[in-house]
Amino acid sequence: MFSKFALTGSLLAGAVNAQGVGTQQTETHPQMTWQSCTSPSSCTTNQGEVVIDSNWRWVHDKDGYVNCYTGNTWNTTLCPDDKTCAANCVLDGADYSSTYGITTSGNALSLQFVTQSSGKNIGSRTYLMESSTKYHLFDLIGNEFAFDVDLSKLPCGLNGALYFVTMDADGGMAKYSTNTAGAEYGTGYCDSQCPRDLKFINGQGNVEGWTPSTNDANAGVGGLGSCCSEMDVWEANSMDMAYTPHPCETAAQHSCNADECGGTYSSSRYAGDCDPDGCDWNPFRMGNKDFYGSGDTVDTSQKFTVVTQFHGSGSSLTEISQYYIQGGTKIQQPNSTWPTLTGYNSITDDFCKAQKVEFNDTDVFSEKGGLAQMGAGMADGMVLVMSLWDDHYANMLWLDSTYPVDADASSPGKQRGTCATTSGVPADVESSDASATVIYSNIKFGPIGATY
């Protein structure tokens, strides 16, 4: 994605990430089943569960109820610096349905955009668990990942994102001794934007250098970022979609400092060791303007299946392809219609290089190692993220409109969808589309050809 940020959104007062655990709210993970397959007729059901990211949770002093963070400002008494903040603050359990609009039923996970309880929650980010204390790690190379999605209620400006990142399975507990909450409480997030809006990173606060956001009442940017490789299997609303690999020179989770992080949060986008843009496949951007949308070939007014295949073996990733199933019909990805890209309908290193030239984009993907480096990250196992968010940085225009907004829409690659360049303003969508919901279901995983 072009301008991804960590999904803090407009959170409940005091919601923040911390590394110790409080006792005010019991933590009970919603249960969710998924399947491992050896062939389309031979799948085993796994009993899984999901956890919400710690950045959404209520964080308070370890001995009481005093918020460590309110609105987009730290409590300077409890959090005068990074280390003291981690020592003083704990995060608490989550009421998934009432507070965050997160529910499960069998193999389905439903995420509601705006949930009103004692406070107002916007969006969510969840992880699939292997156990109550460990994230499940997926070995993607040589395998395929399939899921059903209903995003008929997601308009311009929203993003139902399902993706993988190279987080630590334990949420960073083994690496960082001050992190005693771990995966059970959703700690350890990282991605290719090296997000700096995380309140705690590597077991310490992100207090020092914190600047409150000017357009998000509950977010800000700190002096630390958390980086790792990212594979966006699915970023979409009912108007447009994209899938995008983002390699990092160091694939595993690691921290960075201030503007050296690069990405969305920094003054120099390409200053870090990760590729914030990635190599994206968006059918509309590739010239197929009637392929995806309400009433189109892939009809987003109805549920459909997404199957993503990761070609290669070991740590060698050679190609990423994607097809769809709807109404019992298999729908192949169409080839691009741009003159220099007509031979492509999947992501390869050759495609990525040609696309960057055709679209006049900076080729950071190749600079950071391309599919070879993406494969290096995948080989260590990746955590599944399922989320719903809006974009306080670019209004999601990089996904569903003309971007940059002052670009000639007829120029190759600049028009990514039909949404207006004035659409996607968070204050607008949080009001007009509060009831928006995305449902992910029927996850299947196995060797290429094994799920369908």
UniProtKB/Swiss-Prot annotation:
UniProt entry keywords in alphabetical sequence: Carbohydrate metabolism, Cellulose degradation, Glycoprotein, Glycosidase, Hydrolase, Polysaccharide degradation, Signal
Protein's recorded name: Exoglucanase 1
Function: The biological conversion of cellulose to glucose generally requires three types of hydrolytic enzymes: (1) Endoglucanases which cut internal beta-1,4-glucosidic bonds; (2) Exocellobiohydrolases that cut the disaccharide cellobiose from the non-reducing end of the cellulose polymer chain; (3) Beta-1,4-glucosidases which hydrolyze the cellobiose and other short cello-oligosaccharides to glucose.
Sites carrying sugar chains: 75, 335, 360
Record keyword Lipid biosynthesis present: no
Family: Belongs to the glycosyl hydrolase 7 (cellulase C) family.
Signal sequence, start to end: 1-18
Organism: Cryphonectria parasitica (Chestnut blight fungus)
GO MF annotations in UniProt: cellulose 1,4-beta-cellobiosidase activity
Catalytic residues of the enzyme: 230, 235
GO BP field: cellulose catabolic process
Pfam families in alphabetical order: Glyco_hydro_7
Catalyses which reaction(s): Hydrolysis of (1->4)-beta-D-glucosidic linkages in cellulose and cellotetraose, releasing cellobiose from the non-reducing ends of the chains
